[in-house]
Amino acid sequence: MREVYIIGIGHTPFGKFLERNVKSLAAEAISAALADAQVEKKDLNCVYFGNAMQGLVTGQEMVRGEVALRAFGIDRIPIVNCENACATGSTAFHLAWQSVSGGHSEVALAVGAEKLFMEDTERMFRNYDVGMDMEIIEDLRKQWSEEAKQFGGQEGGGDMPRSF
């Protein structure tokens, strides 16, 4: 196993960004990471693209990374899409690390890109339901409602402040 080094990082500011899409958010973060690493797109051997919710928000499925990265000029290299709920970005990073440590690539890029906020906040929150066992979701809702009441809350987190 070879030693692996993180040679560059990049990120976008946190925000709602109603006017932006996953492509533009990913491009901003990737540009910063490549500049930080002093690496060009042509130096990449592979990309691990982590995204969990784009299919629910925009309908883009199966080739999320290929679509986002092609718009940025990255193509004709292996692009692996990964989804692992809240650990999606960490999973992309782990897979990139494995690729380099195992000698399969010299330069691997890990990307975690999400566009979660949408104007329809009811739909936005419903999107999270699919991250649970759909066969028992009603039982889970009842259980959580009872637990919330035990701690002085209201059903659905009624006294939780909203930031949007």
Predicted segments with their positions:
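Short, intrinsically disordered, charge-balanced linker/junction segments flanking boundaries
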Residues: 158-164
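N-terminal phosphate-binding or glycine-rich loops at protein starts, especially the Walker A/P-loop
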Residues: 10-33
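Metallocofactor- and cofactor-centric catalytic cores in central/energy metabolism, strongly enriched
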Residues: 2, 20, 24-27, 43-49, ...
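Extended interaction regions within the primary functional domain
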Residues: 155
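Pocket-edge structural micro-motifs
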Residues: 8-9, 51
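Conserved catalytic cysteine-centered active-site region
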Residues: 2-5, 14-17, 54-107, 111, ...
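Phosphate/pyrophosphate-binding loops at sites that engage ATP/ADP/AMP, CoA/4′-phosphopantetheine
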Residues: 31-45
